[in-house]
């Protein structure tokens, strides 16, 4: 046997073991978030934060200033090209083909 070729040592870890470890980490992270929320609720900090956060008429948490545009009818796209442009292009190719055929 050639001793220079490394041999792999089998492990007992599988893909599902890695998934389980990841899920455990996520659950423990969420538990930490819930602990912080509970600590804020017990000291009244959550109520103070809620009182300081303005509530808008529409229930949004922040004001969004977006430019207001009138609704335009959506143009049908075929492979990212407007359908009208595509039809005119194919029509032009058809006319060109008929003209070339007539010149034979």
Curated annotation (Swiss-Prot):
Give the matching InterPro entries.
PM2_P3-like (IPR048973)
Q: Which gene is this protein's source? A: III
Pfam families in UniProt: PM2_P3
Q: Which GO terms describe its cellular component?
A: membrane; viral inner membrane; virion membrane
Annotated keywords:
Capsid inner membrane protein, Membrane, Transmembrane, Transmembrane helix, Virion
Designated name of the protein: Protein P3
Lineage top rank: taxon: Viruses
Q: How does it assemble?
A: Homodimer.
Transmembrane segments annotated in the record for this chain: 77-99
Subcellular location(s) per record: Virion membrane
- Origin species, per record, is Pseudoalteromonas phage PM2 (Bacteriophage PM2)
Is Transmembrane helix tagged as a keyword? yes
How does the UniProt record describe the way this protein sits in the membrane? Single-pass membrane protein
Can the keyword Transmembrane be found in this entry's annotation?
yes
Q: Which spans of this chain does the record mark as coiled coil?
A: none
């Amino acid at each position: 046997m050639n001793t220079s070729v490394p041999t792999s040592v089998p492990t007992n870890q599988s893909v599902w073991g890695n998934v389980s470890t990841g899920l455990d980490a996520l659950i423990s992270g969420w538990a930490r978030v819930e602990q912080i929320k509970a600590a804020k609720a017990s000291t009244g900090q959550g109520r103070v934060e809620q009182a300081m956060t303005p509530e808008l008429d529409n229930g949004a948490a922040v004001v969004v200033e977006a430019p207001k545009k009138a609704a335009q009818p959506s143009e049908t796209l075929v492979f990212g090209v407007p359908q009208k442009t595509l039809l005119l292009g194919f029509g032009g190719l058809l006319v060109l083909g008929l003209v070339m055929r007539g010149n034979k």
